[in-house]
Amino acid sequence: MSKLSGLGGRLYSGETSFNFIGNRRRWYSISAIFILASIAALAIQGLHLGIEFKGGSSYTVNKSGISVEQARASVADVGIEGEIIVQKIGDSKVRIQTGALTSEQSKAVELALTQAFNVEIESIDTQIVGPSWGKEITKKALYGLFAFLIVIMLFLAMAFEPKMAIAAIVAVVHDVFITVGIYALVGFDVTPATIIGFLTILGYSLYDTVVVFDKVRENTKSVAAVGKYTYSQAANLAVNQTIVRSANTSLIALLPVGSILFVGAGLLGAGTLKDLSLALFIGLAVGTYSSIFIAPPFLASLREKEPAMQALAKRVASRGNSAPVEATSSQSARPSIQPSANRGPRNQPKRKGRK
């Protein structure tokens, strides 16, 4: 930990610097690979919607010693068409999910389960969701997502600047797209718990991005007036100054989510925990990546296209004080912008005592 603390101090002071902004094409290429894989997964496999969204019937039997194969065989004997999903929940529960059934078919499934497992029909937890209700839930979930993005974009545009809002939304869409693609790849059901997980990672990704952008705004406030360094150089220092904090926060967030995913869902077989924890785990990891490697470089790309910033980059290059970030791939060069020194409460003038 002392080594990590020392690295954080060197990154903050500028003694050590990683060229996050200058290597933007490398980060974009990595994201492009994951996005293409997500597109392929969505096109080939698609999302496996739960019965809450597409409609269907769910039957949960609570009895120790029952197996998935036995439950699947008992329902297959009824002659149900379509996909039948059987999940083991813990040691004593089995959940059977089917498509939309008529009342006669539903009663036949319940009767088959009572005969196969020797239980009372009242002990079977039956849930039937109509297709129209599932479509309504899907529509409301999409409306909520779009409303969230619009409100966040307006807030960031007013609190920071419009281009920061654009970069933050690009990072959020990047996170959601990759998370949804991995979800389609592993084949987990998309349930209301999954939607909650998606909305949660949107909030976390924006939170981490806003912290980085706040430091970027501080470092670039008077970058054109000073004229000693480019916008990308100032933004790169801001990323270096916040990366250790982002890594620590993300690690602390991932540890409990990982324990829920691998222990709670993997060993105990809790379906709801699995749906929620997988979305959170992937989203937190991807959100941390985008807040460092996607949002700041994309913001720098937008700002460096401005005529004022292009003129600033030419002035800096002509002086020969330090080359613009785009022209160098060094990861250990000391940046020309330095954080404020001799500031803070310890360095303030002391008040004289009253006589």
Name these PLM-found stretches.
Residues 1-355:
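A structural signal for conserved, well-ordered secondary-structure elements
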